[in-house]
């Protein structure tokens, strides 16, 4: 069975939605393509414009750009090591095993606020206001600044209780780290499900079907 999702909720600009639908349905014409190309700005540098995130096709490209931007900051660096207990496959780590930050670093939250205060959500962009060996304060674009606490993720295994026929959860391991990652750049793949106010798309090395569409629809 094939299910087609036809309504775009992430974007509200009717003209842009029309362009996205035309790309998705492979019916874009020269007029729509010209409208899209109006957003092509040769020589645009995200270093000169605050709050932009670069969407890249490959992990190493995003990592190199983030490392470059972090190294350019004059403030001291602090590294936070994740606390891993029990069985937790490294390939499934939900956050950085080693998170290095400086004051002024652009970061993205990678999960929703668990405190119930709604201070941040998965994909929200902010900047590190202060950082010490034991404290991180992030200021977001809406002006709110707050202490960020470490989050814990569980690696769970599910089994069927033969007696009750109920599914039971068994936690095999846990991963504890600050729910942040450097966010001057991320991969298009990791941007799926997220929405950004300002983005620059670097899709010159795109390799997967639909990759450019995913980037444009962020």
Show which residues each predicted segment covers.
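C-terminal accessory regions
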Residues: 108-218
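Conserved helicase motor core of P-loop NTPases
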Residues: 1-118, 125-129
């Amino acid at each position: 069975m094939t299910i087609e999702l036809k309504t775009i909720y992430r974007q509200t600009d009717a003209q842009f939605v029309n362009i996205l639908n035309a790309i998705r349905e492979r019916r874009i014409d020269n007029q729509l393509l010209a409208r899209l190309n109006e957003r092509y700005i040769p020589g645009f540098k995200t270093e000169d414009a605050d709050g932009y995130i670069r969407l890249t096709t490959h992990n190493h490209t995003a990592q190199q750009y983030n490392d470059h931007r972090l190294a350019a900051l004059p403030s001291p660096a602090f590294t936070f090591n994740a606390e891993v207990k029990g069985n937790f496959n490294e390939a499934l780590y939900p956050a950085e095993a080693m998170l290095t930050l400086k004051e002024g670093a652009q970061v993205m939250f990678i999960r929703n606020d668990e405190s119930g205060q709604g201070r941040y959500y998965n994909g929200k962009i902010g900047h590190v206001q202060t950082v010490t060996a034991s404290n991180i304060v992030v200021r977001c674009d809406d002006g709110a600044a707050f202490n960020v606490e470490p989050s814990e993720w569980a690696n769970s295994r599910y089994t069927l209780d033969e007696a009750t026929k109920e599914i039971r959860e068994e936690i095999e391991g846990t991963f504890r780290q600050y729910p942040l990652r450097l966010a001057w750049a991320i991969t298009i793949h990791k941007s799926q499900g997220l929405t950004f106010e300002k983005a620059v798309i670097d899709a010159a090395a795109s390799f997967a079907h639909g990759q450019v569409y995913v980037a444009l629809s962020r």
